């Protein structure tokens, strides 16, 4: 009886944060950039947007590499039911953090795993509730000058100095806030045929 094929793993993302998280598994993988329009659709909730984009990213890369197992992920920060995107610049980051101070923000982090050749396709969503402290304008300014998190949904990096902005974090998948829920990702890539612990 022949050994099952050990498929190649591909991360469908250019995010350095997701790459670093997946590398923690100590299994080989490649990175490919998904060509996906990330615009929200009319009436789409932040949760729906994160799920749709995670699957779209995985499918876009899987179409180029049909024999591989592809991981796609997306994160949308949600405040009062509205999506907060990546700020992109200092002024927008200041505005986001001013909006979020003293409030709870839900980070919707979706992950999808796809293999075209086997027909495998799964998706899951991790919701992280982040409670922000009542921040002063001076604290916001000092944080942004120190860490420049303009490429992060919600204008903060919890894995760095951004932790000082928070009162508490409530979730069941610790890395979800950084951009890739690794408990869910491990479960799905193993179901797709990737050996994580060599067993």
Curated annotation (Swiss-Prot):
Signal peptide: none annotated. Pfam families: Maf (PF02545). The record marks 17, 75, 159 as: Important for substrate specificity. One of its GO terms (cellular component) is cytoplasm. The active site is at 74 (proton acceptor). GO terms for biological process: nucleotide metabolic process. One of its GO terms (molecular function) is nucleoside triphosphate diphosphatase activity. Nucleoside triphosphate pyrophosphatase that hydrolyzes 7-methyl-GTP (m(7)GTP). May have a dual role in cell division arrest and in preventing the incorporation of modified nucleotides into cellular nucleic acids. HAMAP family: Maf. This is 7-methyl-GTP pyrophosphatase. It comes from Albidiferax ferrireducens (strain ATCC BAA-621 / DSM 15236 / T118).
């Amino acid at each position: 009886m022949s050994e099952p094929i050990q498929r190649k793993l591909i991360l469908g993302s250019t995010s350095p944060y997701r790459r670093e998280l997946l590398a923690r598994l100590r299994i080989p993988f490649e990175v490919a950039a998904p060509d996906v329009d990330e615009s929200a659709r009319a009436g789409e909730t932040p949760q729906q947007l994160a799920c749709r984009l995670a699957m779209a990213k995985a499918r876009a890369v899987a179409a180029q590499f049909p024999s591989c197992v592809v991981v796609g992920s997306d994160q949308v920060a949600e405040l009062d039911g509205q999506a907060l995107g990546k700020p992109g610049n200092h002024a927008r980051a200041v505005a986001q953090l001013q909006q979020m101070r003293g409030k709870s923000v839900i980070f919707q982090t979706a992950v999808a795993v796809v293999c075209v050749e086997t027909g495998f396709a799964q998706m899951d969503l991790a919701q992280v509730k982040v409670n922000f402290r009542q921040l002063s304008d001076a604290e916001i300014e000092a944080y942004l000058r120190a860490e420049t998190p303009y490429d992060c949904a919600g204008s903060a990096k919890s894995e760095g100095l951004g932790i000082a902005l928070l009162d508490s974090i409530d979730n069941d998948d610790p890395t979800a806030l950084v951009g890739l829920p690794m408990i869910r990702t491990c479960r799905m890539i193993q179901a797709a045929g990737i050996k994580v612990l060599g067993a």
